[in-house]
Amino acid sequence: MARAMGPERRLLAIYTGGTIGMRSEGGVLVPGRGLAAVLKTLHMFHDEEYAQAHSLPEDTLVLPPASPDQRIIYTVLECQPLFDSSDMTITEWVQIAQTIERHYAQYQGFVVIHGTDTMAFAASVLSFMLENLQKPVVLTGAQVPIHALWSDGRENLLGALLMAGQYVIPEVCLFFQNQLFRGNRTTKVDARRFAAFCSPNLPPLATVGADVTINRELVRKACGKSHLVVHSSMEPDVGLLRLYPGIPASLVRTFLQPPLKGVVMETFGSGNGPTKPDLLQELRVAAEQGLIIVNCTHCLQGAVTSDYASGMAMAGAGIVSGFDMTSEAALAKLSYVLGQPGLSLNDRKKLLAKDLRGEMTLPATDVLLQDGMLGCRVAWLLSMNGSQEADTMKDVLLPGLALAAAHAGDLDTLQAFVELDRDLNLKDYSGQTPLHVAARRGHAAVVTMLLQRGADVDARNEDGQSPLLLAVRGRHQSVIGLLRAAGARLSPQELEDVGTELCRLASRGDSEGLRAWWQAGADLGQPDYDGHCALQVAEAAGNADVVALLQSFKDSVCAQPQPH
């Protein structure tokens, strides 16, 4: 990932409809045409003087200067007709993908303006349709129309344009409420609040505040010089089955009938379900007849495992594990895999078990064994000695391998470094150490081992971030505790804008985020730029759970805001 260069960045904004451009007719909201005309009346979206001086077309707008030497110019392409996102299907998403393909050479990035109700589905589907992306595709929308006095649409759309225009993040993303998510990791979690989306099992790719923080190691790398491939042959006959206590086997049998070709089955907890013989038999028969069933947990966070007998029974019935995929991503992936021609049933199941577009987090053992054992490669490299060439190879490769082991939670590989007396404070190009990576990923066992072996608890990467700050942002409470016990403290620079961050978390009702900052030693009474503190923001927003939490932290009482 790199910051986009050049004096002008040209984007295509594809307006499909959605609440952001809706108008009231007869007391209800309906899709509204002419979004470009609305945006031209808002100075934050258009610099008319620059447009006239450069003779820009009527449908092309230009943002005010994002930096002294760069302009973002964007063309608004309005779909005919506009859609309520509840009516969107694979057919419409194929049209969006093909529109991106037709204009791919003309623009450096794309923004898709979409209704929020099915935006997570759209982002997941597009991520599989668009292979070998070299440019950002950012979906966004709003909970309230953009022309309303109090709307989230302005910040969301402006943020999406800036992220697509200023950064080269070659993925299908979703930007909402100051956060850039990987699209196929998102789900809509609130029907009314502005913080409508979350990414349950992957931190945001970027967070916007006083500064823009990019989680560089999470951003997927572009596939070299490969050309964009658009997969428009998606299988529509896939479905979603949510298990519930006492679900009859007869109902499951009826649901699994043709023309259905694939099913995402939402199970309990870590992939568990009823073990009644008649129900398991229906699932087994369907799988033997060629129906592909993917097991996803209906929990918001966590993953499917085989820790319990009922989970093992599901795997024994021929069901494919969806690991930590969202149901939206699993449906999209199933549609994509079933749409690929010439594959056997076994080949399709293998594809479903692979991480194709960053949609799932595979267990560490699966990651390491996909292309061979990482530990064996490290041991071979560490055993090389005697030549200048070997030493050069070690200097180049060892930091990356150490960070890869920390990322995967691979204690055995890291132990190989220790046994051969290698430095575990190796840094990569961005100043990251294995402790940074393990802290961000939440690998408590790896953090423990690294601390015991002398890892620098106060190491800073090139952005001035400590392992403790990364653990806080990942909300990894066990790791925060380990680092604090080892003497880690947040620096004054890391706490400089903490008041604003705490107020943002309080406004969103994010108790887990607030608890992480408190555990790391932050003063939860720190005010934001307006002089308000998190408790006051939570009270004003009516977030009773957050108010109770903040009041339980005895050192988090704040004074009244100072008058302006």
UniProtKB/Swiss-Prot annotation:
GO biological process, one term: aspartate family amino acid metabolic process
SMART domains found in the cross-reference section: ANK (SM00248), Asparaginase (SM00870)
Binding site residues for substrate: D84, S85, S86, T116, D117
Function recorded in the entry: Exhibits lysophospholipase, transacylase, PAF acetylhydrolase and asparaginase activities. Can catalyze three types of transacylation reactions: (1) acyl transfer from 1-acyl-sn-glycero-3-phosphocholine (1-acyl-GPC) to the sn-1(3) positions of glycerol and 2-acylglycerol (sn-1 to -1(3) transfer), (2) acyl transfer from 1-acyl-GPC to the sn-2 positions of 1-acyl-GPC, 1-acyl-sn-glycero-3-phosphoethanolamine (1-acyl-GPE), and other lysophospholipids (sn-1 to -2 transfer) and (3) acyl transfer from 2-acyl-GPC to the sn-1 position of 2-acyl-GPC and 2-acyl-GPE (sn-2 to -1 transfer).
Catalyzed reaction equations: a 1-acyl-sn-glycero-3-phosphocholine + H2O = sn-glycerol 3-phosphocholine + a fatty acid + H(+); L-asparagine + H2O = L-aspartate + NH4(+); a 1-O-alkyl-2-acetyl-sn-glycero-3-phosphocholine + H2O = a 1-O-alkyl-sn-glycero-3-phosphocholine + acetate + H(+); 1-hexadecanoyl-sn-glycero-3-phosphocholine + H2O = sn-glycerol 3-phosphocholine + hexadecanoate + H(+)
Gene: Aspg
Gene3D superfamilies: 3.40.50.40, Ankyrin repeat-containing domain (1.25.40.20), L-asparaginase, N-terminal domain (3.40.50.1170)
Protein name: 60 kDa lysophospholipase
Chain positions of ANK repeats: 141-170, 396-426, 430-459, 463-492, 530-559
EC number: 3.1.1.5, 3.5.1.1, 3.1.1.47
Chain positions found as Phosphoserine: S478
Region (Asparaginase): 41-350
CDD domains: L-asparaginase_I
Family per similarity comment: In the N-terminal section; belongs to the asparaginase 1 family.
Highest taxon above the source species: Eukaryota
Key word Lipid metabolism present: yes
GO MF annotation, one: acyltransferase activity, transferring groups other than amino-acyl groups
Disulfide topology: none
